[in-house]
């Protein structure tokens, strides 16, 4: 389904990029490297930090990390990377995963919109930022993701000024993967998939030594 790069020896390989403009890119990189050290995915996979259009051009998949969506958007525009990111995420042959701020950056519509956040507009969802409150209301919750990741229950999902998906604008294309209540009442979507695009409102990269989510991402989206 996805294009591969070829090494000099002729073996196929894929490159997972981690956008390194701002935010938790090191944590994502460390989780990915641990997955590659502990598992065989059947193909050669390389991890690359992405700061320039040249970096991005080498990637088959891209992770947009959690952080600060306004800063991420402004840096991408100021450095000239935004048009390349836009083209990448709208390419159906590329894989994209956005966590927290990455979810905001990928979304088509913001409920509490900021003029400073120029989103990439690829995921047809309506997102509300800081749905659980500010930094002081951040929390970690044990979640059961076994309905889409076999054996992935009791996963420590960390929500930091987390966005949520209030409305799926294209329910035919966008599939809800995980829902949870906000303030004990309204149920909102915290993870969705649209073919080659995955988003989570929480931070799997902050789950210490638990790499199950990243392992599933590699198997489901990159190595298949």
UniProtKB/Swiss-Prot annotation:
List this protein's GO terms for biological process.
Answer: 'de novo' pyridoxal 5'-phosphate biosynthetic process; glutamine catabolic process; negative regulation of apoptotic process; pyridoxal phosphate biosynthetic process; pyridoxine biosynthetic process; pyridoxine metabolic process; vitamin B6 biosynthetic process
Q: Which UniProt keywords apply?
A: Glutamine amidotransferase, Hydrolase, Lyase, Pyridoxal phosphate
| Listed GO MF terms | glutaminase activity; pyridoxal 5'-phosphate synthase (glutamine hydrolysing) activity
Question: So where does L-glutamine get bound?
Answer: 67-69, 129, 160-161
Q: Which residues form the active site?
A: 100 (nucleophile), 203 (charge relay system), 205 (charge relay system)
Short name of one Pfam family: SNO
One GO cellular component term: cytoplasm
InterPro entries from the entry? Answer: Class_I_gatase-like, PdxT/SNO, PdxT/SNO_CS
| Pathway(s) | Cofactor biosynthesis; pyridoxal 5'-phosphate biosynthesis
* Reactions the enzyme catalyzes: aldehydo-D-ribose 5-phosphate + D-glyceraldehyde 3-phosphate + L-glutamine = pyridoxal 5'-phosphate + L-glutamate + phosphate + 3 H2O + H(+); L-glutamine + H2O = L-glutamate + NH4(+)
Enzyme Commission number(s) of this protein: 4.3.3.6, 3.5.1.2
This protein's source sits in the domain of life called: Eukaryota
State the family named in the UniProt similarity comment for this chain: Belongs to the glutaminase PdxT/SNO family.
What this chain does, per the record? Catalyzes the hydrolysis of glutamine to glutamate and ammonia as part of the biosynthesis of pyridoxal 5'-phosphate. The resulting ammonia molecule is channeled to the active site of a SNZ isoform.
Protein name, as recorded: Pyridoxal 5'-phosphate synthase subunit SNO1
Q: Provide the species name.
A: Saccharomyces cerevisiae (strain ATCC 204508 / S288c) (Baker's yeast)
């Amino acid at each position: 389904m996805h294009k591969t790069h070829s090494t000099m020896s002729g073996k196929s390989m894929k490159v997972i990029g981690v956008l390194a403009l701002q935010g938790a890119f090191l944590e994502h990189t460390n989780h990915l490297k641990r997955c590659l050290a502990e598992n065989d995915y059947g193909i050669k996979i390389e991890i690359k930090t992405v700061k320039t259009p040249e970096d991005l051009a080498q990637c088959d998949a891209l992770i947009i990390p959690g952080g600060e969506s306004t800063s991420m958007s402004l840096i991408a525009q100021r450095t000239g990377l935004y048009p390349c990111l836009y083209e990448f995420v709208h390419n159906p042959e590329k894989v994209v995963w956005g966590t927290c701020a990455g979810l905001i950056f990928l979304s088509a519509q913001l409920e509490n919109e900021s003029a400073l956040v120029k989103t990439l507009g690829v995921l047809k969802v309506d997102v509300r930022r800081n749905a659980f409150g500010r930094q002081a209301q951040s929390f970690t919750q044990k979640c059961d993701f076994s309905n889409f990741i076999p054996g992935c229950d009791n996963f420590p999902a960390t929500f930091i000024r987390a966005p949520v998906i209030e409305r799926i604008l294209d329910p035919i294309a966008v599939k809800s993967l995980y829902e949870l209540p906000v303030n004990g009442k309204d149920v909102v979507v915290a993870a969705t998939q649209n073919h080659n695009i995955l988003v989570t409102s929480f931070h799997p990269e902050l789950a210490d030594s638990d790499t199950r989510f990243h392992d599933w991402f590699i198997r489901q989206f990159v190595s298949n």
